[in-house]
Amino acid sequence: MSTIAESARIHPMAVVEDGATVGEGVKIGPFCHVGPHVVLQENVELLSHAIVTGRTVIGKGTRIFPMAVVGGDPQSVHHAGEETTLSVGANCTIREGVTMNTGTADFGGQTIVGDNNLFLANSHVAHDCRVGNHVIMSNNVMLAGHVVIEDRVILGGGSAVHQFTRVGRQAFVGGLSAVSYDVIPYGMLNGNPGLLSGLNVVGMTRAGIDRAVIHRVRRAYKAIFEGTASVRENAAAIREEYADCPEVVQILDFIAADSDRALSSPTRGQKG
């Protein structure tokens, strides 16, 4: 049996399958389809023709627009029908034609999307991705499987992110870019192949980061990518000098972390 709150408003032409949970204040428009294992938390809104399926939880206040398909099976040849999940956080906006897939059993079975994110038309979140908070994915952005997008990242229209790649906090990826390697926090990447073109100074300024701090991050960036040793060695060499600067420490920790991908750099040669 479905659990449907009294204050939920469900259009008579919508389909809510037995077993679904529909919270207080939820609005479900005409021709929507809600699967039997779906949980719609308070004040979720599904506009006409939206589909939420699979073992999917949609957080409070999230809006899903027409023709979006949220919670579909992972697009993986290894998926054999296992019960995997998708979790979408609160106050997200999921625009027309967006697709989000559940995880795969071999990698924990979870795709996780955070709060206050904006997914523009026809963008795609593949299986096992981790998307943070306050992320903007512009039209036609594609995340392959196992991608990690940290908080406050902006991905320009038509950009594509290779599987297992990480994009660090508050990085900016330009439109139509191919992201094949990890992008450091606060980095700005453009092109195909994607290369670092400096720091996301505009984003840092908008976030209220002090100009003196931005200057220090720029100095650290130059030391990391223009030094004579490898990127990782250069980063390790400046750690003590910048221990009092959280923004630089984030970059250094990101570089030092284990990853399946190399690091994006300002040149075609990867020194990571």
Curated annotation (Swiss-Prot):
Family: Belongs to the transferase hexapeptide repeat family. LpxA subfamily.
EC numbers: 2.3.1.129
Biological process terms in GO annotation: lipid A biosynthetic process
Protein name stated in the entry: Acyl-[acyl-carrier-protein]--UDP-N-acetylglucosamine O-acyltransferase
Pathway given in the UniProt record: Glycolipid biosynthesis; lipid IV(A) biosynthesis; lipid IV(A) from (3R)-3-hydroxytetradecanoyl-[acyl-carrier-protein] and UDP-N-acetyl-alpha-D-glucosamine: step 1/6
Keywords, ordered alphabetically: Acyltransferase, Cytoplasm, Lipid A biosynthesis, Lipid biosynthesis, Lipid metabolism, Repeat, Transferase
Pfam families on file: Acetyltransf_11 (PF13720), Hexapep (PF00132)
Any one GO molecular-function label of the UniProt entry: acyl-[acyl-carrier-protein]-UDP-N-acetylglucosamine O-acyltransferase activity
